[in-house]
Amino acid sequence: MSKDGNLNTSEFDPLANKEYTEEQKQTLEQEQKEFLSQTTTPELEADDGFIVTSASSAQSTPSTSALSGNISPDSQTSDPITKAVRETIIQPQKDNLIEQILKDLAALTDHDLAEQKRKEIEEEKDKDKTLSTFFGNPANREFIDKALENPELKKKLESIEIAGYKNVHNTFSAASGYPGGFKPVQWENHVSASDLRATVVKNDAGDELCTLNETTVKTKPFTLAKQDGTQVQISSYREIDFPIKLDKADGSMHLSMVALKADGTKPSKDKAVYFTAHYEEGPNGKPQLKEISSPKPLKFAGTGDDAIAYIEHGGEIYTLAVTRGKYKEMMKEVELNQGQSVDLSQAEDIIIGQGQSKEQPLITPQQTTSSSVEPPQYKQQVPPITPTNQPLQPETSQMPQSQQVNPNLLNAATALSGSMQDLLNYVNAGLTKEIDLIKEAATAILNDKKSDIAEKQANIIALAENTVNNKNLTPDAKVAGVNAVLETIKNDQNTPDLEKSKMLEATVAIALNSENLEPKQKQQILEKAVDVGLSLKDDASRAAAIDGITDAVIKSNLSTEDKGTMFIAVGDKVNVSELSNAEKQKLLGSVLKKGVEAQVLSPAQQQLMQQNLDKITAEQTKKDTIKKVNDILFDPLSNTELKTTNIQAIISNVLDGPATAEVKGEIIQEITNTVAGSSLEAHDKAAIIKGISETIATHSDTSLSLPNKALIMASAEKGIAESQANLPDRELMTKGLVDGIYEGKGGPEITKAVSSGIDNSNINDSEKEALKKAKDAASEAALDRETQNLTEGLKGQNIEEHKPHDDIYNKVREVINAVNPVIEALEKSKEPVVSAEERIVQETSSILNNISKLAVEKVNNFRAMLSPNGNLKTLEEKKEESIKKVDELVKAFGTKSSTEEQQSFIKANLIDDKTLSKEIRLQTIDKLLQEQKRAEAIENPSVKTEDVRVVSGKSKLKPISKDKPDIEKAKMVVGRDRVNIKGNIKIMRALMNARDSIQSENLNKSTPIKRESSPPQR
């Protein structure tokens, strides 16, 4: 190995010992310098990767064809994205490869063999255009290898790959309107480590499919050889933990991760190639790994399971986010699920990879997955510096085969390589033996039937302590040893879980207080203990384990900063665990509370942990809310009106909740999306959406500000826009949303928010335009309705004519009458406290201020009166109401038997009650006066009115007295109390005074004008 840590290939690489002229050496050195100096960043950098998900079984039918690379028959249509990858990338590559093979066969000197192979290709192509049998036949290996040596073909295959992935990603992107389509990965950094990122993948129903974890590996530089012989240094790459089994939610998933350049950065978009895992919906609805698509040919930088995959593309080296071990796992799962085989860049690419030895065993689709990983051609094996708790792995560099190699040099290099491998195996065996001994000791302790729980705990603690304090072990080996103890505790079937939690706490305490471990190594042990604690069977044991571990952190001799880091590590482990949101919420809340109380968390750490807790809480709330909404929507016994009312109640609870406006918006977006995607009729869904919108618009401004209402309304529209409903239904629901805003008297800011929701939705531009037109049409219709209602309300009204009894005129008079007392009071003030000039200015300002306030109040009243819900009515309506009210008052007056009761009635109902209009009160007085005059006419026949005569003449009663027959008849007509002449005089006086008082109200409200009236002539 060279001093700088790179592999010294001259010892092991036969080609490195080839003699070059001085000119050739200078040329090679210059090419290497030029390559290493290429640091210009592309203008358009490729995305990290893309994710596409679906919860619809209609979009994904599991393929049942064998692991052969065949495209499924029409009757077995596979996932459309998987099919598109085959048709736009894999099949065109195969077609070009076959074309080159046929050209090579035509130039073959053995014409019989050439004709035989040509017929074999043509006959199979008629049956199976993928030619899987041809590519799987070992006898065809040399023809495939030779074709791939053609540089023009290599360029074609690379261009097909780049263009194909770009086309697939664009066609099936969410931005293009494909439901649940490809969208860039949104990674979130772990708080505890900057080299760890994660993202939660959900199906289009919002259910979690899996959590992807990405690790950026900073490694000691190692070299990889390109096909032209130049070498490239690799010091950074990433690994993604692609899931093997998915059992959380239904649907399909495609993970397409961009290959990184040799320096660990992303390539430009025009050079981007991807490693894609296709998970199609299985028979049970859960995603199954059915196929892997990757660039060709796929190689690995070593023989160990942790060796990273890489490719050479366009003359450059790119690393893929998958290791040899992970690739083997994935291929085994593909075979298990009987999915489509990998394309040219997998099983078949491995067969035809350039530079492979002819003696290597052929990898066919029917072989086991472990053999489907291409072994490297030349292994340069030296003991690299790696953590001693992991087996040491040789670094591998694949070199081109096209040059002639000296057999003696090759044999010498191979022998030396074998010796180095033996040395590595010996070192690894020693380390493995130490860890195995620790495991055996832990197992023996826990299985000792003679020991009780306390003794077992003491012995486990002693074992962990001895491991940490063993000076013969490296720090990494100590970590591996303690973790082996923890793993043994986890797997033990005899120890109760609560007792296991105590062992975890004690083991963590030993590690944290050790002076032989660095903080990073202590954290590794703590994280392993948390993993074991979270794997316990019941929630009480899990809670006890986490509580004990955090107690150990607080009691340790770590610095406050390191304690905070440990708490964050515990929180991160809880956050990414497979536990339910409810349990995560409880555990994370407990960790946060304890960290705050112990004052080990910085404000930034508290905020980050609180954000994670809020996300979990919001997710749980969202899940519970959507379940309630679905229960309402699918209730067969409730009609649309009842469904709307019940969902409105849920909306109100969400708006009143403690969550942020953003979280409330997310929940309501899920609700509208659920409603829009339901199986109800379009008009029923629109009615429910209208109710939701009205509830948001009318919600109290004190608990929900106007900007937050607008934010939530935009989210509501986004839920509609991104739903699976067809476009006409979404247009109708958008109109319903706007109608609800107008019904709820929402302002223009809320209406504009609907457009914002459309703009921010993940749909194509034509759909956005259609929804905006629907929104504008609904707004115009609502304004037309308001205008029409105002017009109807003003029919028959002449607002400009100032009649004494007109409502508008009276409102203006009220303003004047209210201002007059203010002016009079100021004029009477004779105690100036300032100079005359200042007093005039102050008084004038005060008067104007009062006038302004009163004017604003009255104008608002005037506006309210003119609104569709105001009190402005037509003359006919007002007349009918007045007559009805007058009759009610006269009837009520008639129930009063004594003069005192009648006078009290007049004062209370006709003078003091200002809620009645002047017109009604005056008409009532006029009618009562007429009644009194009829009674008077009975006593004085000379003033008897025609009305009374007519009424009296219709009476069929006989006179009681011959002297005064009319009196008796009149008693029957007007009632016995109304013939009391003295009482009549008092009542008539009271009525006339009341009339004068009412008429003078506009002139002086506080002082009614009394009028002296003499009794009428008798």
UniProtKB/Swiss-Prot annotation:
GO terms for cellular component: cytoplasm. Residues 53-68 have a biased composition (Low complexity). Residues 1-11, 69-80, 355-380, 387-402, 996-1007 have a biased composition (Polar residues). The keyword Phosphoprotein does not apply. Residues 19-34, 1009-1018 have a biased composition (Basic and acidic residues). This is Antigenic heat-stable 120 kDa protein. NCBIfam families: Sca4_fam. Residues 1-82, 355-402, 995-1018 are annotated as: Disordered.
